[in-house]
Amino acid sequence: DNPDAPQASFFYTEYIAKNGNQRPVIFSFNGGPGSASLWLHMGVLGPKVIKVPSNASDDGSPPYKIVDNKLSPLSEADLVFIDPIGTGYSRAIGCHTGEEFWGVNEDPKIIAEFIRRWITDNKRWNSPRYILGESYGGIRGPLLVSELRSGSITPIEVNGLLMVAPASDYQYLVFHPGNNSPHYGFLPSYAATAYYHDKVDTDKSLAEFYIDSKNFSLNEYGPALLKGTRISSEEKNDIMKKYSYFTGLSMRFVEDFDMRVDASSFRKELLRDEGYSVGRLDSRYKNTDYMAGGQYSDTDVSSEGFMSAYVTAIHTWFADIGVEMDMLYQSGDSDVYFSWKHPTQWKGNDFGYVNTVPHIARAQRYNKDFKVYVSCGLYDLATPCFTAENFMYDNSVDMDRVVFSEFEAGHMMYNHQPSFDRFLKEVREFILND
């Protein structure tokens, strides 16, 4: 009944330079929904980072390698890592429950309130401000920009939005019957994965092969899917041959799926003859399943390949800097994920797909200085590069004000050392070129 009573307690980690009130501030979070910020914190941005094998092999058991991050953007900007409610040590308090803040619309409102208070408490109203989000952060980030700049309390403009492997438009990511968007969006990442695992017959470089796959997907495959049963048998056969060429899948398999192979089936089928499945977050990873003959893999072998190292790293770092809490640090919470409210749902039925990309276009229209950086990995089978490219072009975004960067890596491209180096170089340039 008391609107001024505390509703939630945010846990966050800040790195601030002394007497640096004019320095840019980067507010960073991961995705899920239901994920804490440890992945960006300990993987690439923070002063200390965990090093997992760059070649997509398993991280094994501790001790793991935690090193100084000499490329951290801390040299140019202050960093604030935010754990959304229900993740990390952030919790609803008093009579409030986490479910009140778990939703597409609810989540950015409470995080925007946190940022407003942080800016006020730290006297940073005239500092350049950036939002950096990964994965579901591609949903949260654009909504947060709108919530900050047009909120009912105090409007706050943001200088830029940085999205890592963004999941900003679910139409391009969800494999539902009748939705062709993910099929032509995922195909180039299927092609890159098949190329990496030597399942394609080509003398071309990866870059050339990947570009060819995008052109095929956009100009031939996508239109063929739109034709549905109107497609001629001759054209369908031609499309299936090219699909097989780019993906490394057999013609029979492609035909059985009516040219619409979902990502889970692709991950299981590509290396089936070798007894492996490939990873979802990073398809360079491969491992065996309990049943080689199943339709889907047992788990995401790429997540299994690095999660332990990251969780160990955040707990080790917090212990080193004196963080002591009488509760569990929730690196990821499935309860948050499965309790998340989507505004397109009514009585359990989907009536549409969440899409926050129009918020990016809106920010561009009303803030002449607003700019965007998008990074993605060619081997990401969760939020592929071409899906991000498609939904940016499909929602009136001014691409002249977008830096779009592709990496020969996965969802967390910073697990790949050359991509780690280039990503941080580009982030620094993006901030400094304001």
Predicted regions, residues:
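N-terminal cap/lid subdomain of alpha/beta-hydrolase-fold enzymes
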Residues: 6-100
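A catalytic-pocket lid/entrance helix-loop region that shapes and gates access to the active site
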Residues: 46-52, 145, 149-233, 237-242
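Alpha/beta-hydrolase active-site loop
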Residues: 73-74, 84, 101-119
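Alpha/beta-hydrolase fold nucleophile elbow
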Residues: 124-136
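Glycine-rich nucleophile elbow surrounding the catalytic serine of serine-hydrolase chemistry
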Residues: 133-146
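Alpha/beta-hydrolase fold catalytic core
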Residues: 227-382, 394
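Catalytic histidine neighborhood in serine/cysteine hydrolases
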Residues: 396-412
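Catalytic histidine-centered segment of alpha/beta-hydrolase-like enzymes
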Residues: 410-420
